[in-house]
Amino acid sequence: MLLETIEKENDIKKIPLEQMPVLAQEIRDFLLESLSKTGGHLASNLGAVELTMALHYVFSLPKDKIIWDVGHQSYTHKILTGRKDGFKNLRQYGGLSGFPKREESPCDAYDTGHSSTSISAGVGYVCASKVSGEEYHVVSVIGDGALTGGMAYEALNNAASLNKNFVIVLNDNKMSISENVGGISSYLSNLRTAESYTDLKSEVKKTLNKVPGIGPVMVQRIHKTKDSIKQLMIPGMFFEDMGIKYLGPVNGHDCGRMIQIFQEAKKVNGPVLV
């Protein structure tokens, strides 16, 4: 079993990408069997398996910080950081906590339990890294339900002013935010996250700016046209209007695609929401 090869953090990086669906199924089977005996949060964890796997594949713990809002969906995170054997005593006295707990593992960056706090904590970590000079990535995972909390929007407002990488993952389980569908949206999402698109956009801008007189005007009009199209086609413009780059939407059960998106997100010099 692939799951038996996961003994500590970052072991998932050794798993071939084509084997990720197998590992995801093994994790779900383990959760179903284990939680049927101990109880615990089942549905939220079954829905976040691939998301967690992709984050652990792209980022390096405990150096990088993953902050889970509420934290009840962190069971796969605990499994991938070497705590699988502790599930036999999950949520029992002296046993494994049902939420992230810093004293339990250095891979738990923040003690959670209440909702809408993860983005604020992430902003704090980013600011702390700037003060200390430490280099690490910060990821805040928040659900659409928790995003309704006012504290989350205050944090988004503060995050927009950061000039350092900060990844916010919106885990939309369709309980509060309507699903986005359509080939145009998927196409634009793929296009915007491709390095070739980013490079081409930069070259076109440089070339047009060299045109005497009308060059800068053409660049400005192209930007306005592009933004108008994005407003119609891409749901994340709300975040972009706040100054936070948006990448998505992404199928939360497509581990390979999420790995690709997170690899692009960690290169952004500033806040980015997936």
Indicate residue ranges for each PLM-predicted region.
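Acidic active-site catalytic centers that drive phospho-/nucleotidyl reactions
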Residues: 11-14, 144, 172
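Gly-rich Lys/Arg/Thr-decorated short loops/hinges at beta-loop-alpha junctions or inter-strand turns
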Residues: 2-8, 30-34, 96-109, 136, ...
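N-terminal amphipathic, basic-rich helices that act as targeting or association modules
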Residues: 1-81, 238-262, 269-273
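Cofactor-binding active-site loop characterized by glycine-rich and histidine/acidic residues
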Residues: 41-162
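Active-site flanking residues adjacent to catalytic metal/cofactor-binding acidic residues
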Residues: 68, 143, 170-171, 274
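Long, well-ordered, tryptophan-enriched scaffold segments
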Residues: 174-273
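A short alpha/beta connector and helix-capping loop motif
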Residues: 149-171, 181, 185-194
